[in-house]
UniProtKB/Swiss-Prot annotation:
Residues 81-107 are annotated as: Disordered. The lineage of its organism: Bacteria, Pseudomonadati, Pseudomonadota, Gammaproteobacteria, Pseudomonadales. Residues 92-107 have a biased composition (Gly residues). It comes from Pseudomonas putida (strain GB-1). InterPro entries: UPF0229 (IPR006698), vWFA_dom_sf (IPR036465). Transmembrane segments: none annotated. It comes from the Bacteria. Belongs to the UPF0229 family. Pfam families: DUF444. This is UPF0229 protein PputGB1_0427.
Amino acid sequence: MSYVIDRRLNGKNKSTVNRQRFLRRYREHIKKAVEEAVSRRSIMDMEHGEQISIPGRDIDEPVLHHGRGGKQTIVHPGNKEFTAGEHIPRPQGGGGGGGGRGKAGNSGEGMDEFVFQITQEEFLEFMFEDLELPNLVKRHLTGADTFKTVRAGIANEGNPSRINIVRTLRSAHARRIALTGSSRALLREAQKELDRLRVEEPDNFTDIQEVEQEIERLKARINRLPFLDTFDLKYNLLVKQPNPSSKAVMFCLMDVSGSMTQATKDIAKRFFILLYLFLKRNYDRIEVVFIRHHTSAREVDEEEFFYSRETGGTIVSSALKLMQEIMAERYPASDWNIYAAQASDGDNWNDDSPICRDILSKQIMPHVQYYTYVEITPREHQALWYEYERIGEAYPDTFAQQQLVSAGDIYPVFRELFQRRLAT
């Protein structure tokens, strides 16, 4: 029984190419719809895509036609209503055919919006388009688990799917020439002798018959040699080479002190969920370190970071000190691209804010690729914000700070912080 194996890239989804072309064409409409969806839905609600609506006027194909207005002379075959010289009244413009709410119209026509669904993968692709971790430059072989397959010559053994047909046939041809060389030489001599006998001694049937038998014997010997032997088989040799990979670590520092209201904590968690989703989708080799802090800081796992209800006073420097210790112990700056994202409401013990600036400027900023700080407050900024502004003046390319007032600000601020930079 024969089996047909479908190895096409699209498989059964024959319209995949057309769908991708459609998504590229209406990219701006889809991006706008995705941004609106992110602002109104929960960041954790990513199990499905989004329903996209495109106005009917935007999906019309451009066509060449006569413009409205002007004078035209047209012959209508079989016209019984009008005669030459009469004026045909101009058709009225459309009025009541649009899709939407409003009063009914008695004339005109319109077109409903085109609505379609994008998948979860497509939703995330548009959501994180043009975003990246800045300054991801350090690449090392240490601990690399990524490899690339490269050609490494020809081998005598290997997988049948990697057989080199040209080299195999060349080897078989060389073997046949080498093993049949003497027989072919004798065959040529016998053929010459037969030709001579047929011309000079045509009646010498005995010698002619003997030479013919010798020729047949030599041909049989040559033909017994197999056209292809296992010795001839040659295979493309492929080897895996370690591929230098960018190792990165992201420190997530979240304030869970008593001054953070439940609404403020929810905004902070949504920001970090969006960041975590972005990292895990776009980067294969990246580690995330979660740090919660109030008067003291602790490294926690993902579950505790997002769902623990522990709270207390506010000493922001405790989180920065812990981050510096973890960097020194596990993530040397010579091998790792180090990033950090900090979220707080800005409330801090007054004497602690200068300490935070000192730790950042001397122990952290010289070793990180990028540090972001988001302050979640509708009020005026406090001392911590102004201390961090001084950090931004000293490190304008690797430090950024933004303010969040409501949940609707999360996605725009996130895009602002991680917008892809043009190479300089």
